[in-house]
C-alpha cells in the first residue's frame, strides 16, 4: 500500500511540474551537436587509402553518444561534385553510422574541395538535411592534401559561422593552406599522419570533437592577438530567455563592451581587441523561467604576430640564389616559413619549407638572367600567417673570360 501511495505522489508531482510550465532546459552533461565528415573520395586517393579512411571514421564514431537529443552525424564526399552519403537525421546510433560508413563507395573524379565546403556549409545549417539550430557545429575534413580549387574562402565562411574545423591530412599538402583552414590552435585541430597510422590519433581526435560539442562551462578558444571565440553549454532556449555578454579590458571599466544574444546561442566571437591584453568576460543568462548564475572568465590575447620585416637576396648565380629574412622567429611563436619564388613574367612556382628558428635558404634550379618575385610567409601557431615579398634577379648564364696579359717569350727582347 505504501508503495502505491509513493508512486501516486511522484506521478502527481511530475504532472504538476509539467503543467506549471517550468522549463528545466537542456543539461550540460549530454553533448549536443552536428558533426559533418568531409572525405576526399576523388581519384587522387587510392582505393586502399579510402578503405583505411572509412575504418578510421568508423573508429571515431564507435563510442560517441549519438541520438536525437545528442550528437548527429552526416557524411559528404569530395569529388567532381559533392555528394551526401547520409544526412544528420538519417541514423540515430553509432552502430548504424559505422555500418553506413563501412559501405560508402568511393566517388572518384576531381578533388573540388572548395565546392564541397560550400555545399557542406549549406548542409550544416539546413533543416531539410537534419541540421539543428543552436547546437555546436563541427566539420572533420580528411584529405590527402591535394585540392583542385581554393579552400580558403569557404573555410573562413564556416569558421565565421562558428563551425569548429578539424583537418586530418594523410599527405604533405600545402602547410600554410591547411594551417589557415583549421581552427586554432593548429596543434589541436590539424593532424598530419600516414594513412596506415590513422588509428593512433583516433582517441585524441574523438575527445577533441566531443569537447568542441560540449563545453562544460564558459570557455575561450581560437585565441588570437586581436580576438577570441567564446562557447558555453545550452543553458536557455530561444523562448526561455537571452544572454548578455560583457567584455572588460583589464583596468579599463569605461571600455566595457556588451552584446545581447538569443537564448539558443552557444558561442560568440569577439574581434578588434588589443594584443597581449587581459580581458574579463561575463556571461549573464537572463530568464523569467528560472534563475541561472553568471559565468566569468579571464582571457589574455596573444602578442602581436610580427612576420618577416626585411628580405635580403645574396649569393646570386645563374641558376640559384640565397634568400634571407629578419627577424628569425623561434618555435615558440611560429611553426615555420614557406618561401615561394616565381618568374615575374609567369611560369612554374618554386616553394621551400623552412623550419622555425632558421631565416635563410638557397633555391636551386632557376633560369639565368630572370627576375623573380620572392615571398616569405611565416606560419604562426594561432593559424594565422604574415608574408613579405621582394624582387630578385639571377645572374647571366655567360661567363666573361678576362684575357691574360701577354708575357714576353723566351729569347725575345722587349722593344
From Swiss-Prot:
Residues 1-18 form the signal peptide. It is found in: Secreted, Extracellular space, Extracellular matrix, Basement membrane. Disulfide bonds join 369-393. Keywords: Basement membrane, Disulfide bond, Extracellular matrix, Glycoprotein, Phosphoprotein, Repeat, Secreted, Signal. Glycans are attached at residue 264. InterPro entries: ECM_Assembly_Org, FN3_dom, FN3_sf, Ig-like_fold, VWF_A, vWFA_dom_sf. One of its GO terms (biological process) is protein homooligomerization. The modification Phosphoserine is found at residues 74, 80, 93. GO terms for cellular component: basement membrane; collagen-containing extracellular matrix; extracellular matrix; extracellular region; interstitial matrix. One of its GO terms (molecular function) is microfibril binding. Residues 214-305, 307-405 form the Fibronectin type-III domain. It holds the Pfam family VWA. Homodimer or homomultimer; disulfide-linked. Interacts with HSPG2. Promotes matrix assembly. Involved in the organization of skeletal muscles and in the formation of neuromuscular junctions. This is von Willebrand factor A domain-containing protein 1. It comes from Rattus norvegicus.
